[in-house]
Design a protein with these regions (language model features):
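Single-pass alpha-helical transmembrane segments
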Residues: 428-446
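Extracellular juxtamembrane "stalk/ectodomain stem" immediately N-terminal to a transmembrane helix
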Residues: 366-429
Length: 446
């Protein structure tokens, strides 16, 4: 009778497990976030910490940057200026005045919340000094290493530039390398054959390309954006819908150049030539030519070397909240008194928990290599943890889980082979299903 009462619950749990399994198949990235740094486990000595590789969640990194323009007086409005529409040279009713809030277009409007009407945007001065080039450098600085997780997207309120370069720095702006070139004619502008991100392969992913996809004059709103395609590059390893994140994490873990490619401290947008409407420059109406950007999106996370799952913005600075006995803005060194072995970056492998590579106390002495996955295998279903300890399956004990755990006389008998066998003795107790054991039942069924 009692077992019959449990049947509906068991069937419901089985259905739930099945649906969870299907969800994991369709959205595999949910297990690949590495958002837990440690958890408590039971060992022979009692409760202990099990350490895992971890990283902060991805977020909108434009909330934490500092923007710099060069030349510094390139923003419109000082003195006030009237602009004409690129498509209609006779529509000259747009005014920029830095002294009037409603008419000003300062740089911070590239990072405010979009959706307001009218749209807010930064705007440069017009091309009044033609034929001298109208060029602007927009530098985004985080004073912290960050890892990009999604496409960089620039939305232009004006026509998209006819020539532009996106650059990155890994040393806080001391040196720069190009990420991508943009032009209406790549051969003419940069002596490069035009390509797209779809032309890249696993072998050429790190190549710097010039694309013509984002430099044509716009007619519709969707043609206002310029992208640097991060996800298309991820997809070369993770598949078109990023289902195989295990493959991507494996590549990032073992290929330093690949991981560095998606890591930055600064971005620089070099605007080299404004939109001209694919025609000759009208020297009689230079108020038509300028740059205007309404939005910049940079999605990423703090780089914490897989030693932290959170990052804080305090007193104008980003910093990792380090775990694993590490310290520093990037968790890139061991804490004081934790130099028992050299600091090491965490590892995504083995998936899904990775390897923490924690710093250990200085007086800990050399770390013995108790087990591995080759010669010194943990027995009876045990697992090797950081080469230092076997986590034994229930019912087994010993350095390599080689012995049965005996609870009392008669619980286990030594066999002639030197191995032990377990014997179950009925206790006569009756167990009822309660809310307390429900999560354990769910885990065991799944």
């Amino acid at each position: 009778m009692r077992s019959a009462m449990f049947l509906p619950v068991l069937f419901a749990l089985q259905a739930l497990c099945t649906s969870v399994g299907h969800a994991m198949q369709h959205y595999p990235a949910v297990w690949g976030h590495y958002d837990v740094c440690k958890s408590q486990i039971y060992t022979e000595e009692g409760l202990a910490w099990d350490y895992m590789a971890c990283q902060p969640e991805a977020t909108d990194m434009t909330e934490y940057l500092r923007v710099t323009l060069d030349p510094p007086n390139i923003t419109c409005g000082d003195p006030p200026e009237t602009y004409c529409a690129l498509e209609n040279p006779y529509m000259c009713n747009n005014e920029c005045d830095a002294a009037t809030e409603e008419l000003a277009h300062p740089p911070e409007l590239m990072f405010d919340i979009e959706g307001r009407n009218p749209t807010t945007f930064w705007q440069s001065t017009s091309w009044k000094k033609y034929p001298k080039p109208l060029q602007v450098n927009i530098t985004l600085s985080w004073n912290k290493t960050i890892e990009l997780t999604d496409d960089i997207v620039l939305t232009f309120e004006s026509g998209r530039p006819e020539q532009m370069v996106l650059e990155k720095s890994l040393d806080y702006g001391r040196t720069w390398t190009p990420y991508q070139f943009y032009a209406t004619d790549c051969l003419d502008a940069f002596t490069m054959e035009p390509k797209t991100a779809n032309d890249l392969t696993q072998q050429t992913l790190l190549d710097i390309i010039c694309t013509e996809d984002y430099s044509r004059g716009y007619v519709w709103k969707n043609d206002k954006t310029v992208r640097f395609e991060i996800k298309d590059r991820f997809a070369l390893f993770a598949g078109p819908r990023l289902h195989n994140m295990a493959s991507l994490y494996g590549q990032l873990d073992t290929t330093k150049n690949l991981r560095d490619f998606f890591t930055i401290t600064d971005l620089r947008i070099r605007l080299l030539k404004p939109a001209t409407g694919a025609t000759m420059v009208d020297e009689n109406n230079l108020s038509r030519y300028f740059y205007a950007i309404s939005d910049i999106k940079v999605q990423g996370r703090c780089k914490c070397n897989l030693h932290a799952n959170s990052c804080v913005f305090d007193k104008g600075k980003l910093g990792c909240e380090c775990e694993h006995n590490t310290t520093g803005p990037d968790c890139s060194r061991c804490k004081k008194h934790y130099h028992g072995r050299a600091w090491s970056v965490g590892s995504y492998l083995p998936i899904p928990k990775g390897t923490a590579n924690i710093c250990i106390p200085s007086n800990h002495g050399p770390v013995p290599r108790v087990c591995d996955n080759a010669m010194l295998r943990c027995q009876n279903g045990g697992t090797c943890h950081h080469h230092q300890r076997c986590h034994c399956s229930p019912g087994f004990t010993g350095i390599l889980c080689e012995r049965a755990r005996c609870q009392g006389p008669g619980d286990c008998d030594d066999q002639l082979s030197g191995q032990a066998s377990l014997h179950h003795r009925p206790t006569g107790r009756h167990h009822t299903l309660t809310l307390v054991v429900f999560p354990l039942l769910f885990v065991s069924l799944c």
